[in-house]
Each structure stands twice: as C-alpha cells, then as structure tokens.
C-alpha cells in the first residue's frame, strides 16, 4: 500500500483508516472522520442500521459528504511522489544516466529517451509517463465504477430481502391473530378448522422463511464475489504510479468484466396461498348491502397513492395514457356492520375500501389519513397488494370479486377473496372513529 511511504505528518492525513491506503474518492462524516467512499460502504454492508463511524462509533445514517479538496490533494501528492521517484539517481537509466520519462506498453517498463529509440524497443507503443498514468487510472476507475454500480444494486437487493424477511415474520404473526379473531366470530365455533388453518399458516410461513434466507444467502454470495474483485481493483489503484504502470492487469480486468456480467439474483417474492374459511362469506352476507356509487370520474392520470406509496415502491409507475375511474358511495356509514362485493376481474389495477370525505385536487383524487384501502398494483412482472398498514402484503391476488366488510363499532375494515371464501387481510380494530363511505378506483385494461 502507498501508505507505507507516508512519513510526512501532512501526508499521513491522506491515509484511509479502513484500508490503510491512500484515499480514493474521500468522504467525511459529520463527526469529522474521513474514509474512502467504497471502504466506508463496504465496511457497513453487513452491519444493521443505524450505520456508524468505524473510528468513533457515532451513528451517521449513511450520510456523508464528498471531500473534493482532499481528492485534489491526493492527486497532487501522488504526482509529486512519481516525480521524486523519476528524479532520483537510483532510478535513472543505468546505461545512459538519463531520467526514465517514457513508458513502453509492450514491455511494461520505464525507459529513457535514448532507450526508447533503440532497436530492442522499435515497433513498441511508447508514450509519456503522464499519459500512461492517466490512461491506466482511467481504465482502472472505469472497471471500478462498473462493479461499484452493480455492488450498490446488489446491496439494495440484500437489504430488500432482509426487510422482506422481517416483514414476513411480522405479517404472519399479525395474520395468525386475525385468523383467530375471525374464527372466534364463526357460529357454531370451528375449533378444529381453526387449528388446522393456523397449522397450515405456520408451515407455509416457516417454509417461506427458509426460502427467503436461502435467497438472501445467494445474493450475499454473489455480492461477495463482486466485492472481492472490486477490492483487488481498489488495492491496485492505490499503488504508487510507478508500480502501477509496470503491472500486468489483463487478468484482473478480464475477471472484472466477467464479474460485471454475472446474473444478479434479485430475491424472491413470497406469496401466501389463499386458505378457505368455512362459512366466512355466508356469515358476511348477513350484513350484505347494495352500494350505489356516485361521482364517477374519468381521466388519464390519478395521484391516488394512499400513504405515499411511491416512496415505498419507487419502481411502481403510472401510464399517463391509462384511463382511471374513481367512485365513492352515495351514503356514508357511522354505525353498524356492512358488507359489499366489488367485481374486479376486468381490471389489472384497482383500489377498494372506505374513505372519509373524498375530495379532488385538479383532476386527481387525494387520499386522507382516515382512508382505509386495499390496493392492487402491477410492479415489474408481478402484482402486489398494499395497504396503509405496512405497505406490501404477500398474499395471493384475488382474481374475481373482493368482499369488503365494514365494522363501524369495531372501527376496522376487512377484505375477502369471495371465490375462495378466504381472508385477504384486515385492518386492526380501532383504526378509525368517524363516518366513512365506500370507495372504488380502477384502471381499465
């Protein structure tokens, strides 16, 4: 490492405390400590949030600032060392006692002007050392940049898989509680069916959890392969220029290109299979009401995104050419229990639920904190179900009618897959305490 030659106190400040090499793309934290950007992020890749400074252990939430001034200082110092090396007597040409200011790319050696004109090096590609250093560093940094972009994407996949695992554990625990509550309201009691349902839920939960962990391990393995090659490139980029020039980097560059072309596993999408609850739809039909919708609005774009869904699913996009319809019930409900069904088989994206007082901003519907929705969106090549309670839900997408059960006294809403007589999900009791009205929005296919 070039840091071995740092004796001057001022030059010691150019050494990264993580890799012990000269800074590459230096950044500094709020606490004042400085590191190579890659070193800092690679150091944090397996550490749970919040991230912390490797020197003082102060949390920094992965916020840092690029130190442009220090980067310039590093460049100046490295060039200064190269010139000191070239000007030293011990590194002059032994034959001609002249400075070696020319680089032979074929032989990978430094030459003086007279040696470069000799018969031995005729036909070889020569250039000044400054140009050779610049070209070598540009090629190194190009490979590093390519791998770094893939590393960041891969790290995002790792973090996403870990979040998915945590949410899966949490959602399965909550779902078990909801299932017990639903069975508790069935008449007559279905204790045996409830126990079988919960046993099936736990089995699927554990099986999926194992698959999620295997998926994470696969992603981590691929990321580590990229990291290994990246560290080699970074180590080479920190070598003194005079050493860097004479290195044969063809094999390293070849492995870098192969690593950059590796397929990146993106993690799995868990799905909870629908499980029928005997008598569920029959019981809910005792609260059946006919809902009349009004104020149906047709437009090519809607900002309907309850709970800022774009922040949770940034890859979810809207097509401005699509036709949206937003409708809400003529009547609001503040007491009692009500159940209605919405036929969704002809829609690829839809939202059902209840809202307080629908209002428009321009030609768009704007959701409020009291709105309780179940929303189906297309994300990449699959569908997701989302709600205000935690974002995405890993539940099998209903293909026909969705039932909506509103309990005003309990202050919650439940959604049912009518065809399979299964619970999609349910908001917790006490979620709202106001009059609400049915809501429906869809995108035409």
Swiss-Prot record:
Ranges where the B30.2/SPRY domain occurs: 271-445
Q: Mind listing the UniProt keywords for this protein, alphabetically?
A: Metal-binding, Zinc, Zinc-finger
Q: Which parts of this protein are zinc fingers (RING-type)?
A: 16-57
The record ties this protein, via CDD domains, to:
RING-HC_MmTRIM43-like
Q: Does the keyword ATP-binding apply?
A: no
Which Pfam family is one of those matched by this entry?
zf-C3HC4
**Residue intervals of every B box-type zinc finger in the record:** 88-129
Q: Which GO terms describe its molecular function?
A: zinc ion binding
* Chain sites annotated for binding Zn(2+): 93, 96, 115, 121
Q: Which family does it belong to?
A: Belongs to the TRIM/RBCC family.
Q: Which PANTHER family does the record cross-reference, listed alphabetically?
A: E3 UBIQUITIN-PROTEIN LIGASE TRIM (PTHR24103)
Name by which UniProt lists this protein: Tripartite motif-containing protein 43B
Identify the species of origin: Mus musculus (Mouse)
The opening ranks of the lineage are:
Eukaryota, Metazoa, Chordata, Craniata, Vertebrata
């Amino acid at each position: 490492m070039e840091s071995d030659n740092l004796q001057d106190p001022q030059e010691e400040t150019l050494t990264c405390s993580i890799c012990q090499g000269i800074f590459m793309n230096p950044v500094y934290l709020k606490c004042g400590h400085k590191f190579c950007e890659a070193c800092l992020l690679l150091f944090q890749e397996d550490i749970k949030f919040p991230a912390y400074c490797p020197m003082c252990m102060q949390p920094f939430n992965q916020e840092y600032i690029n130190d442009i001034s220090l980067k310039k200082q590093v460049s100046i110092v490295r060039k200064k060392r190269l010139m000191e090396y070239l000007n030293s007597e011990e590194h002059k040409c032994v034959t001609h006692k002249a400075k070696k200011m020319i680089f032979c790319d074929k032989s990978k050696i430094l030459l003086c002007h007279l040696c470069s004109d000799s018969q031995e090096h005729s036909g070889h590609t020569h250039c000044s050392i400054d140009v050779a250093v610049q070209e070598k560093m540009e090629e190194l940094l190009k490979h590093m940049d390519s791998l770094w972009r893939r590393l960041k994407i891969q790290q995002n996949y790792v973090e996403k898989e870990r979040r998915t695992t945590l949410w899966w554990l949490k959602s399965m625990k909550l779902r078990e509680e909801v299932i017990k509550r639903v069975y508790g309201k069935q008449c007559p009691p279905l204790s045996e069916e409830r126990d079988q349902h919960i046993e099936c839920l736990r089995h699927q939960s554990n099986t999926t959890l194992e698959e999620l962990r295997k998926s994470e391990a696969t992603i981590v393995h691929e990321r580590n392969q990229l990291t290994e090659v990246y560290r080699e490139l970074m180590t080479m980029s920190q070598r003194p220029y005079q050493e860097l020039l004479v290195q044969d980097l063809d094999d390293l560059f070849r492995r870098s290109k192969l690593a950059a072309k590796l397929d990146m596993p993106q993690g799995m999408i868990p799905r909870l299979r629908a499980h029928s609850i005997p008598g569920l739809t029959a019981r809910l039909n005792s609260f059946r009401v006919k809902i009349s919708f009004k104020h149906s609005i047709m437009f090519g774009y809607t900002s309907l995104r309850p709970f800022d869904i774009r922040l949770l699913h940034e890859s979810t996009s809207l097509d401005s050419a699509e036709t949206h319809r937003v409708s809400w019930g003529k009547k609001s409900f503040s007491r009692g229990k009500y159940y209605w069904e919405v036929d969704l088989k002809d829609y690829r994206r839809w939202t059902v639920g209840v809202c307080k007082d629908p209002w428009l901003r321009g030609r768009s519907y704007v959701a409020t904190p009291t709105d309780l929705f179940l929303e189906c969106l297309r994300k990449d090549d699959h569908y997701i179900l989302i709600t205000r309670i935690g974002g995405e839900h890993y539940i099998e997408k209903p293909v026909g009618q969705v039932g909506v059960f509103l309990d005003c006294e309990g202050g919650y809403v439940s959604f049912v897959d009518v065809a399979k007589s299964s619970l999609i999900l349910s908001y917790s009791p006490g979620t709202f305490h106001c009059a609400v009205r049915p809501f429906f929005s869809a995108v035409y296919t």
